[in-house]
């Protein structure tokens, strides 16, 4: 009797172990597939390495969904834009800043504020789209998303326009440019993924 119980217990433990291994393997394969989806999608962007680096950690949430991928790309762009905006605002107190540089920083700060607003509007609009819908409302909303995201990219470019010319060259410009370029690349990638999502409808 005791031997039968021990045998049953051993078999039960083996069953649980096998089930756990199979489940872990399935999850690993699913995760790998999700990651490959992101990698393949990022190849359609202008900055695929940055795209994959920024989005691969969200693979389990994205799960091969083009819309979710575009939403996540926008969310990443917003976070990067907010960070850049904060950084630019701190540069108004940069040591030795000239009047012209101060004006350029102020203009850039305004442009980054617009960038955050436009990207936030894009994300909200994208989330309002109905799954499976491809009617006029869908394309109208998607047009808004594209327009706002493109405008955000223009704002980011305009931010650096104020630092044009040799007189504006130097460390301040270089420091700000590093942050703005990062945002612009994320935004460009987000726009490409939005277009990729649109092409599937």
Swiss-Prot record:
Reported effect, residue 103 to A: Slightly reduced ability to repress PME3 in acidic conditions, at pH 5
Keyword field: Apoplast, Cell wall, Disulfide bond, Secreted, Signal
One term under GO cellular component: plant-type cell wall
UniProt signal peptide: 1-24
UniProt site positions, description: Required for pH-dependent PME3 binding and subsequent repression in acidic conditions: 110
Cysteine pairings via disulfide bonds: 42-51, 108-159
InterPro entries listed in its UniProt record: Invertase/methylesterase_inhib, Pectinesterase_inhib_dom, PME_Inhibitor
Tissues where this protein is expressed: Accumulates in etiolated hypocotyls (at protein level).
CDD domains given in the database record: PMEI-like_3 (cd15798)
UniProt subcellular location: Secreted, Extracellular space, Apoplast; Secreted, Cell wall
Chief site of localization: secreted
The UniProt record lists the keyword Signal: yes
Outcome, altering residue 110 to A: Strongly reduced ability to repress PME3 in acidic conditions, at pH 5
A GO BP annotation: negative regulation of catalytic activity
Annotated NCBIfam families: PME_inhib (TIGR01614)
Subunit-level organization: Binds reversibly to PME3 to inhibit its activity; the stability of the PME3-PMEI7 complex and the inhibition of the pectin methylesterase (PME) activity is pH-dependent, based on protonation status of amino-acids at the complex interface.
PANTHER family per the UniProt record, alphabetical: PECTINESTERASE INHIBITOR 7, PECTINESTERASE INHIBITOR-LIKE
Family membership noted in the UniProt record: Belongs to the PMEI family.
Function: Pectin methylesterase (PME) inhibitor that can target PME3 in a pH-dependent manner, mainly in slightly acidic conditions (pH 6.0 and 5.0) but not at pH 7.0; this processus relies on changes in the protonation of amino acids involved in intermolecular and intramolecular interactions. Regulates homogalacturonan methylesterification during plant development.
Protein name: Pectinesterase inhibitor 7
Organism: Arabidopsis thaliana (Mouse-ear cress)
């Amino acid at each position: 009797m005791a031997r039968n119980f021990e045998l049953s217990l051993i078999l039960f433990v083996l069953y649980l172990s096998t089930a756990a291994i199979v489940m872990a393997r399935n999850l690993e394969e699913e995760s790998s597939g999700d990651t490959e989806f992101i990698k393949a999608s990022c190849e359609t962007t202008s900055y695929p390495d940055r795209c994959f680096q920024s989005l691969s950690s969200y693979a389990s949430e994205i799960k091969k969904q083009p819309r979710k991928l575009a939403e996540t790309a926008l969310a990443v762009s917003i976070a990067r834009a907010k960070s850049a905006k904060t950084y630019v605002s701190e540069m108004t107190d940069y040591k030795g800043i000239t009047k012209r540089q101060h004006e350029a920083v102020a203009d850039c700060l305004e442009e980054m504020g617009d960038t955050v607003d436009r990207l936030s509007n894009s994300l909200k609009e994208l989330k309002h789209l109905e799954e499976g819908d491809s009617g006029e409302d869908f394309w109208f909303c998607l047009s808004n998303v594209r327009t706002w995201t493109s405008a955000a990219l223009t704002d980011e470019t305009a931010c650096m326009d104020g630092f044009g010319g040799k007189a504006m060259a130097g460390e301040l410009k270089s420091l700000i440019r590093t942050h703005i370029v990062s945002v612009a690349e994320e935004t460009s990638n987000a726009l490409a993924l939005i277009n990729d999502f649109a092409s599937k409808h």
